[in-house]
Amino acid sequence: LYNQDDYNTNVNSSLIASLPKRKMGVAARLSYDYDHRYMLEVNAGYNGSESFAKGHRWGLFPSISLGWNISEEKFWKPIKPVISNFKVRGSYGLVGNDQIGSDRFAYLAIVNLTESPSYTTGYGGSTTSLSGPTYNRFQNNELTWEVGNKLNVGVDLQLFNSLNITVDGFRELRDNIFQQKNSIPNYLGTASTKIYGNFAKVKNTGFDLALDYGKQLNRNFSIQMKGTFTYAHNEVLKYDEAAGLRPALSQVGKSLNSIWGYVA
């Protein structure tokens, strides 16, 4: 499958905003099912994005999933009236993300030519202010895709042809997360200059439980009940932080968007 997007916003507020947004990608899928017992699916996406510099625009994101319908095996027949369906499955794959902030072409530098004044020199009362160009954002041609490594294992179970139970456990390691660099001291002259890169890493874990009970009591009456439960936890594994930051204020080891404050 080939896909190409060319989206023109017709916005003339700036030169960059007036440029059409473009993406390209190729996707492929291979599925195999043997006797409703053994299932295999392989997917791959090769995607290109305008969000990155030449040499980093394309990313390959494969995935694979396996399933075994145990209840279709011959040895399962004696207990099939009780456990009508029993299937185990698992999947692993990579998922790419090119939505890195609100600015287009974040790898390019932004230079301000009209800053006034830009620089101050001298000491005490003898100072001189001069005008000149300044960087609002430094160039970084190494910006690339955020990548999620996703692992999922699950069980599908049906009891007495009425109660369906689905359990899924998941783990995702999201690497190369887009972030503004905070570890460069202001005295190096970058206090008002933004520097972006793929600096952060986050781990997400959890599980989902779904119950579905249905019963046809007679020709005119049936009952249906459903319920779900989800548990999810995330942890920051890597984050570019200011040098000398107190451990209590560090993002690393804590959940995303943690709240800092006094405990009453």
Predicted regions located by residue number:
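Transmembrane beta-strands of outer-membrane beta-barrel proteins
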Residues: 1, 40-42, 62, 81-90, ...
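Outer-membrane beta-barrel transmembrane domain signature of Gram-negative proteins
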Residues: 1-41, 50-53
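Transmembrane beta-strands of outer-membrane beta-barrel pores
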Residues: 2-6, 44-50, 70-72, 92-96, ...
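Flexible, surface-exposed loop regions and adjacent strand-edge segments
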Residues: 12-17, 57-63, 105-112, 182-191, ...
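Outer-membrane beta-barrel signature, preferentially recognizing the C-terminal barrel domain
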Residues: 15-24, 115-164, 194-218, 255
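Residues on the lipid-exposed face of transmembrane beta-strands in outer-membrane beta-barrel proteins
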Residues: 28-34, 64-68, 90, 153-159, ...
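Short loop/turn motifs that connect adjacent beta-strands in outer-membrane beta-barrel proteins
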Residues: 37, 71-86, 162, 216-223, ...
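Conserved small-residue
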Residues: 104, 214-264
